[in-house]
Regions:
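Histidine-centered metal-binding segments
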Residues: 2-15
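Acidic, low-complexity proline/glycine-rich segments
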Residues: 13-33
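Divalent metal-coordination and catalytic microenvironments
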Residues: 27, 54, 93, 148, ...
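Secretory/endomembrane lumenal or extracellular ectodomains immediately following the signal peptide
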Residues: 35-37
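Alpha-helical scaffold segments that form or flank carboxylate-/histidine-based iron centers
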Residues: 39-55, 74-95, 162-165, 169-177
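All-alpha RGS (Regulator of G-protein Signaling) helical domain and cognate RGS-like helical scaffolds
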Residues: 63-71, 77-81, 85-95, 99-149
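An amphipathic alpha-helical core segment
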Residues: 135-189
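Conserved small/polar residues in nucleotide/adenosyl-binding loops
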Residues: 190-197
């Protein structure tokens, strides 16, 4: 089993870069119970989102990288250097692992330490950051991601369409919000703004 690390925020990329004996990326088990995000995200949504969508992105990445210069590259290198379908699928693999890992570490606690200081310095307060982050997700036209990225001591909210990923632009991701429809469409009573807050 081949694993590599890129150390991006909460995610070490070990999960992203785990491969089988044929050098194919593999879907790793979700690091928590599928129902543990309820009532915010339903078990059905987690099963479909993680088990179907993420699995499809992994499968597509494996097919598209086979026999190319990217075949033995870690996911973060594919994201930085590839384009088209390979970039889109590899970025979605990273984006989804990062998203689900962040949900695993999330909770009712406000950030502490250096992150808390940086949020205050860049946004005024944690509450101000949450409001701006949520607004960025609501304002994003179509599907995509909203990222909290860091460059030195500067934090930035970076709305990104489609599969865009901050690694491609040399940014360090700290947090993401998935605003693709598959993140919430299975429960009609869920509305995007409820999930973003």
């Amino acid at each position: 089993m081949n694993t590599e690390s890129c150390h991006c925020g909460l995610l070490s990329c070990k999960e992203v870069n785990t491969r089988d004996k044929d050098n194919k990326f593999t879907l790793q088990p979700l690091p928590y119970a599928e129902n543990s995000l309820e009532p915010y995200i339903s078990e059905k949504t987690v099963k479909f989102h993680y088990g179907k969508h993420l699995a499809a992105y992994i499968d597509n990445t494996n097919k598209l990288k086979a026999g190319t210069q990217f075949d033995d590259q870690p996911i973060h290198e594919i994201i930085k250097k590839a384009s088209g379908g390979l970039f889109n699928n590899a970025a979605q693999v990273f984006n989804h692992y990062f998203y689900f890992e962040a949900l695993h570490h999330s909770g009712a606690q406000a950030p502490r330490g250096k992150l808390s200081n940086l949020l205050e310095k860049n946004f005024g307060s944690f509450e101000d950051f949450k409001e701006k982050f949520t607004q960025a997700g609501t304002a994003l036209f179509g599907s995509g991601w909203v990222w909290l990225v860091q460059e030195d001591d500067k934090l930035e909210i970076w709305p990104a369409p489609n599969a865009e990923n901050p690694l491609k632009n040399g940014r360090y991701p700290l947090l993401t919000m998935d605003v693709w429809e598959h993140a919430y469409y299975l429960r009609s009573e869920e509305h995007t703004s409820e999930l973003q807050s």
